[in-house]
A protein has these predicted regions:
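A conserved mid-protein helix/loop that constitutes part of the nucleotide-sugar donor-binding site
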Residues: 17-22, 207-230, 247-253
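Conserved acidic donor-binding segment of nucleotide-sugar-dependent glycosyltransferases
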Residues: 321-322, 326-332, 341-346
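Carbohydrate-associated surface elements
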Residues: 163, 185
Length: 373
């Protein structure tokens, strides 16, 4: 049995956290003894873990050090102004403040959080392992500037899509030989099972659209709301439901009010089980501005839903326009045009659904990549 250590930020309610849990659940228990080291105490999704995992909370010798760790990522404009030496001394200092002792030499150690954070530096300098890998979850790799020194200690740098790997290699070509794709895995049968659970669905007798994701600028809800405003003016009989929470909730609800869409665009909040809502919608829409690998698109494909996504590089790895779903340019007008087209041509959506049923998703080759780090 191999000793596997994974360092992550938390088990909170984000896409990368879901991806982490799904990866752990997919690993054969007879092959891996897993230790999960967490930076934060947010364990909202811990109930999703199906197996016994040794969970360790990182502790620090001072409140000051712990507070510094909360600055786990910096905006790109800040990164451009600060020298790399600043981050090296910053991360080295915090790593020396960790009070946990990891004496074991692990077979594999994974920095699953990535994002150019303290986690990447900590695993590189304080964990002994035969093989090390770090994960990249987004197409915007600017923050990796802060951990370039530590990337040399990793055997693999995994991007969750080819788009992520390509963006990273353009920015940091000297690490090209270490970079490879490792797609996020999900338990398809579990998603199907959960989609059948009883849930009070507030859908009306009209064209029901669902979007799942955090209420943040990245996820493009503002674009969706503006697209909904266009659809309303075109007399389309629809209702759009957003599932998720986030820092932009108040701002987005104000935009809904400004556009007089209280009856057409409804925020349902976070849902432990969003799959019944997805299963019963007429169209699943993902209007993201950028993504690493869109897990909700994988879930929508697993449920064989009619799908419309913004035309971003990582989405193109999953969606072939007109084959297994549809893509639209990242604008309210383009999104509204494509939704109106699908509303008026349901047979086109049925065609993509049939394709999804005939071409199930297979993740079996992804897990083998851990053996080849």
């Amino acid at each position: 049995m191999k000793e596997l250590l994974i360092v992550a930020k938390s088990l909170g309610g984000g896409g990368s956290e879901v991806a982490l849990i799904e990866l752990i659940n997919a690993l054969p228990e007879e092959l891996y003894n897993i230790t999960l080291v967490l930076l934060d105490s947010d364990n909202e999704y811990a109930y999703r873990l199906k197996k016994n995992v040794n969970i360790v909370q990182l502790t620090f010798n001072s409140y000051f050090a712990k507070s510094l760790v909360s600055m786990y990522a910096f905006p790109a404009k800040v990164l451009k102004k600060l020298s790399v030496n600043y981050f090296i001394s910053y991360y080295d200092f915090i790593a020396n403040c960790v009070t946990n002792v990891f004496e074991k030499t692990y077979d594999i150690a994974i920095d699953f959080y990535g994002y150019g954070s303290f986690v990447t530096a900590f695993l590189a300098t304080k964990i002994q392992a035969k093989k090390k890998a770090t994960w990249l979850h987004d197409e915007k790799p600017y923050w990796m500037k802060s951990v370039q020194k530590y990337l040399g200690k990793y055997d693999k740098i995994y991007g969750v899509s080819q788009a992520v790997v390509d963006a990273f290699c353009r920015e940091y070509p000297h690490f090209k030989d270490k970079a490879a794709v490792f797609y996020n895995v999900i338990d398809i049968e579990e998603i199907k099972r959960k989609s059948e659970q009883d849930e009070v669905i507030p859908f009306q007798d009209n064209f029901n659209i669902v979007t799942v994701g955090r209420l943040t600028e990245q996820k493009g809800y503002d674009i969706a709301i503006k697209a909904a405003s266009i659809l309303k003016k075109r007399k389309i009989n629809f209702a759009w439901y957003g599932i998720g929470g986030g820092r932009d909730e108040k701002k987005l609800k104000k935009l809904v009010e400004k556009c007089c869409l209280e009856n057409q665009f409804v925020f349902l909040g976070r849902k432990k089980n969003p799959y019944p809502y997805m299963k019963h919608c007429n169209l699943y829409v993902q209007p993201s501005r950028h993504e690493g690998y869109v897990i909700t698109l994988v879930e929508a494909r697993a449920l064989c839903l009619p799908i419309l996504s913004s035309d971003i590089p990582s989405a193109r790895e999953q969606i072939q326009d007109g084959v297994n779903g549809y893509v639209a340019d990242l604008s309210a007008e383009a999104l509204a045009d494509k939704i109106e087209y699908l509303y008026n041509n349901p047979s086109q959506m049925e065609k993509t659904v049939e394709y999804l049923k005939e071409h199930p998703i297979d993740f079996s080759t992804e897990l083998l990549k851990l053996e080849n780090i």
